[in-house]
């Protein structure tokens, strides 16, 4: 009788686990990468002067190398695009339907540029997406230049104080003339939209 009760309890627990996993997998906000023990303590990926995670200027622009370099944390999709008049290979690292990291490579077949949009990936200096301009710079002069973000917002790109290989793209509200950098007083509340590493 006790054996029947144990089997019945085990069967109930198994069915419960299957339903729970099926429910999680079906929800759009769920990511299988969250089940990885590495995700329990935050991202192990870091941005440095050398690259992002294990990816650097010597990493081949192929799926296996990039997946390994990003700890298998994302779903990858690839394609080609024209950037500054050159045809480049692009890998997009996705979490569900959100772009988290974009990697670009030129004709030599190596990674040449990485754009990080994932708030969980910090630089080795503690900088991350969402940080305000005022946390890193007191003024734009000498470090920043005007640009336009992918989202067509007003934007500036500022070279990291720690490395010329790392830049921060800041976006924010400004109604001034196109082509000019906003005043430092306006910029102080702009936030990092993406962190860029270049070879």
Indicate where each model-derived feature is located.
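Surface-exposed, gly/pro-biased binding rims or lids
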Residues: 167-183
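Bacterial N-terminal signal peptides that target proteins for export
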Residues: 2-13
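Short helix/turn-capping signatures at newly exposed starts of structured segments
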Residues: 25-152, 159, 179-199
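Short, structured protein-protein interaction patches enriched in aromatics and acidic/basic residues
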Residues: 157-164
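Broad, structure-driven detector of short, well-ordered beta-strand segments within folded domains
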Residues: 99-105, 164-172
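Short secondary-structure subsegments characteristic of cysteine-rich extracellular domains
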Residues: 18, 156-157
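Low-complexity, intrinsically disordered short peptide segments enriched in small/polar/basic residues
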Residues: 12-15, 163, 189
């Amino acid at each position: 009788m006790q054996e029947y009760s144990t089997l019945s309890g085990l069967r109930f627990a198994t069915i419960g686990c299957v339903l729970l996993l099926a429910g999680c997998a079906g929800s759009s906000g769920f990511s299988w990468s969250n089940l990885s023990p590495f995700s329990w303590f935050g991202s192990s990926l870091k941005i440095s002067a050398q690259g992002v995670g294990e990816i650097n200027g010597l990493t081949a622009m192929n799926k296996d190398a990039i997946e390994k370099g990003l700890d298998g944390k994302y779903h990858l999709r690839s394609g080609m695009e024209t950037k500054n008049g050159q045809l480049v290979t692009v890998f997009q690292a996705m979490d569900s339907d959100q772009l988290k990291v974009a990697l670009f490579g030129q004709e030599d077949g190596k990674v040449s540029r990485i754009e990080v949009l994932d708030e969980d990936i910090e630089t080795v200096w503690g900088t991350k997406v969402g940080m305000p301009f005022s946390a890193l710079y007191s003024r734009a002069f000498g470090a920043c230049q005007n640009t336009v973000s992918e989202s067509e917002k007003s934007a500036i790109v500022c070279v990291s104080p720690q490395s010329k290989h790392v830049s921060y793209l800041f976006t924010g509200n400004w109604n001034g003339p196109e082509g000019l950098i906003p005043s430092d007083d306006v910029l102080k509340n702009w936030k990092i939209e993406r962190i860029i590493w270049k070879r």
